[in-house]
């Protein structure tokens, strides 16, 4: 029999920690929990797959930061998009203005020159550089500041 998905309310910012604590309890007490999902884009909630709500209640009992199970089930279609991994460079186009948020160039503003979705990398040229040298950076090291304005 397939499990049902339930949303568990947790303390904002403690989603991953709470999921790990629940996982540890599930392993210790051999509870019938099939999956625990803590998507980074959803704050204050984690999703637990189990045969019924009672099992989830048992799993979160005594767990710090777990606030309770929401009534009802969560349809799989509502969380399916969290399971698809999108490259960090999706949505970027050549000419976009980005800020480097990690690595040795952190804080620098740059213009996107080229995008390699297969490697999840982006080639940029720094705005403030005296000599414009293209630099390849990991896609999750950049944050979009503004899109290229397309003229019609």
Swiss-Prot record:
GO terms for MF: mRNA binding; structural constituent of ribosome; translation elongation factor activity
Domain KOW as annotated: residue spans: 94-124
Domain of life, source organism: Archaea
GO cellular component: ribosome
UniProt KW keywords: Transcription, Transcription regulation
Pfam family, one: KOW
Gene Ontology biological process: regulation of DNA-templated transcription elongation; regulation of transcription by RNA polymerase II; transcription elongation-coupled chromatin remodeling
Family that this chain belongs to: Belongs to the archaeal Spt5 family.
Cited PANTHER family: SUPPRESSOR OF TY 5, TRANSCRIPTION ELONGATION FACTOR SPT5
Functional description taken from the UniProt entry: Stimulates transcription elongation.
Quaternary structure note: Heterodimer composed of Spt4 and Spt5. Interacts with RNA polymerase (RNAP) independently of nucleic acids. Forms a homodimer in solution.
UniProt comment concerning the protein's domains: Composed of only a NusG N-terminal (NGN) domain and a KOW domain, similar to bacterial NusG. The NGN domain is the effector domain of the complex that mediates the interaction with RNAP. The NGN domain closes the RNAP active center cleft to lock nucleic acids and render the elongation complex stable and processive. The KOW domain may interact with RNA and/or other factors.
Designated name of the protein: Transcription elongation factor Spt5
Taxonomic source organism: Pyrococcus furiosus (strain ATCC 43587 / DSM 3638 / JCM 8422 / Vc1)
Lineage: Archaea, Methanobacteriati, Methanobacteriota, Thermococci, Thermococcales
């Amino acid at each position: 029999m397939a499990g049902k998905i339930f949303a568990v309310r947790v303390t904002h910012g403690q989603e991953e920690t709470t999921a790990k604590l629940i996982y540890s309890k599930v392993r210790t007490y051999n509870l019938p929990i099939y999956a625990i999902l803590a998507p980074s884009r959803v704050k204050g909630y984690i999703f637990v797959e189990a045969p019924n709500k009672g099992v989830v209640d048992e799993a979160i009992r005594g767990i710090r930061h777990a606030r309770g199970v929401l009534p009802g089930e969560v349809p799989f279609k509502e969380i399916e998009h969290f399971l698809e991994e999108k490259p960090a460079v999706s949505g970027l186009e050549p000419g976009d203005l980005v800020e480097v948020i990690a690595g040795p160039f952190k804080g620098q503003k740059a213009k996107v020159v080229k995008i390699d979705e297969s490697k999840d990398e982006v080639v940029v040229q720094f705005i403030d550089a005296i000599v414009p040298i293209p630099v390849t950076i990991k896609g999750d090291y950049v944050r979009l500041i503004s899109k290229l304005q397309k003229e019609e």
